[in-house]
Amino acid sequence: MKKKLIFGVIVVLLLSSCGFKIVNNKELYNYSIIDVKSSGDSKIGYLLKNNLQVKNEIQNKKIKLDIKIIKNKSIKEKNIKNQITKYEISLNLKVEYNLDFSNESGTFSISKTGSYDVEEKYSQTKNNENNLIAELSNNLVEEIKINLSEITNDL
């Protein structure tokens, strides 16, 4: 019994100071996006540009992006009367990056899918579509930032 207690105390003491530190996300975004070009859907391109172009003058890691946007809108569900009840939107991005600080370049792809309901009024349906596009765009921006931080920090 005493051996188990002593062993437990030793294990706790050794593991409690193992040096693990929670990574602060702000420290990972140590780059500056200086130029964003987009082709494809202009509305989504506008949303992506506005959310990505945060210039941090202090950082010396400057990145240029070229984003190709492919938007697919398809019917997801129909009811018994063959009326459309849900649409599905799929956003596919091909992001080409150019790192000015190391003359390195490459590409990565990101894809997000979501669906929205068809309402009785067209304006409500259009509003649902716009809200979904904004939400998917914000999710894509976060994924782009994560991928860029992994690339710039060699994670």
Model-derived regions, located:
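C-terminal motif of bacterial Sec signal peptides marking the signal peptidase cleavage site
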Residues: 14-17
